[in-house]
Each structure stands twice: as structure tokens, then as C-alpha cells.
């Protein structure tokens, strides 16, 4: 039932909306995270260690995923909810 809904036109709009939310969340979180580290600790990107890149990248991914999951609920209701009568 879920796969059938996702393959419909509304399902494709829902998936596109999720992709848009993830991209927006990732760009905002990236800007805040990377900019915060550079401002707070005065460490330019050229001086970052590999572990700093890994930690910051995983933090960006996790936060973006959380925001996407949270916004998937209203998007799912809007796009995949039942038909109003």
C-alpha cells in the first residue's frame, strides 16, 4: 500500500518535497556548523584535521536527516493523506 502511494503522482511530489527539505536543511546546517567552527575557534578549513571533517560531516548528515524526518510528517499528511469528501 505504501509503495503504491509513493509511485503515484502525489507520492512523487512527496519524495521530491523530501529531497528539497533535505537539501535545504543540509545547506543551512552546513553553513551554521562550518561557519560556527571557523568563527568560534578561528581554524580555517585548510588547517582542519581529517577527524574534524568526519565529525562535522556526520553531524551535518544526522541533523539534516532529523529535520527531514520531522518535516516528512506534515508533508506526508499533505501529499499522501486521504481524500477529503
UniProtKB/Swiss-Prot annotation:
Superkingdom of this protein's organism: Bacteria
InterPro entries: DUF2534
Swiss-Prot/TrEMBL keywords: Cell membrane, Membrane, Transmembrane, Transmembrane helix
Entry's localization field: Cell membrane
Gene Ontology CC: one annotated term: plasma membrane
Membrane topology annotation: Multi-pass membrane protein
Name of the molecule in the record: Uncharacterized protein YnaJ
Origin organism lineage: Bacteria, Pseudomonadati, Pseudomonadota, Gammaproteobacteria, Enterobacterales
UniProt gene name: ynaJ
